[in-house]
């Protein structure tokens, strides 16, 4: 099905789903959906609910403190950031995906690519899904940098998605035709498909029109038997520990008929709880934005004087 997006093989949808749920397993459900939750598990559920409801702006607002959110908006406008797109699944592939789907005759080209590579190849698709699943598991088992809990979660995620892909009707030509039509139609309704367009629109101005495309992408996965929104809405958890402004929660969610489990650290900042990883990532991003801003600013010696010319030191007596 990745053919519908980029004219490639079935691995694309499995990867899209894996990335979507890897991030999604970390998100949201509060009494007032516009306000950060005061309790760690509820904070994660609240973010997940915003994603399930295609509210990318609301998700972003719940992910970081208000003061940091404003700075991230500024960094976006200045071209130093595309957060939160960079932490969402397929964030780095979103613009190329939109560009491919918006090309003239995209539907016909993608359908021809599908017919050439996947149509009627159910056995080959199943074998490819199994092989990719096995490769992914072996890769994760030898990858350093994960905690045992993270490694176990990612392995279970890859195994579940590989199993789903083996049984999904990925090689069905009629289904692919409707999938391609849906994605091409949704992509053509997005206002921009390049870096300059995103920067000009601003963070909220970019996220809002992207939401319908994300909704269509999730609906396509659902039509192939992978309920992303169901998984997001199923997020539940328990508080394992709290030490000062740091907490650890165990989350569970249901994906393709299997219960998934993972542990996540959260940090309290300015009152509410946020994912520790998100705070660290955005802190680093803002530091880089500040450094880029400083590098682009003229030094005091280069700053123009009041008369409009470069300032020069007075002559020595």
Go through each PLM region and give its residues.
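Short, well-ordered alpha-helical segments enriched in acidic and aromatic residues
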Residues: 55-70, 189, 193-200
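Acidic, glycine-rich loop-and-strand cores that form catalytic or ligand-binding grooves
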Residues: 192-222
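Bacterial N-terminal signal peptides
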Residues: 14-24
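Bacterial N-terminal signal peptides that target proteins for export
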Residues: 2-14
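A short hydrophobic beta-strand element
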Residues: 243-251
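Short beta-strand edge/turn micro-motifs at domain boundaries
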Residues: 102-196, 205, 248, 259-292
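Short, low-complexity N-terminal intrinsically disordered segments enriched in polar/charged residues
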Residues: 26-53, 61, 68-74, 78-116, ...
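Compositionally biased, proline/threonine/alanine/serine-rich low-complexity intrinsically disordered stretches
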Residues: 31, 288-317
